[in-house]
């Protein structure tokens, strides 16, 4: 959907290193949002993606709060948010 509206997208995905053990092979503070999307007119968005019952961790909240304090637009999006996501990406 983001590509349809010409957003540049960076999606960080975890890798399974052994059964039940997942890591994201990035350096830096833990909890950085899953998506960073940039559009030359529509701005920059940081997004934490969660499953329907997924819980935002304390380290993820630390990043969300730090980014918001810095004036960034940050969202936690779930599958139920599809209409809201579509509207934001189109505006």
List PLM regions with ranges:
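Catalytic phosphate/metal-binding cores of nucleic-acid and nucleotide-processing enzymes, i.e., regions
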Residues: 1-91
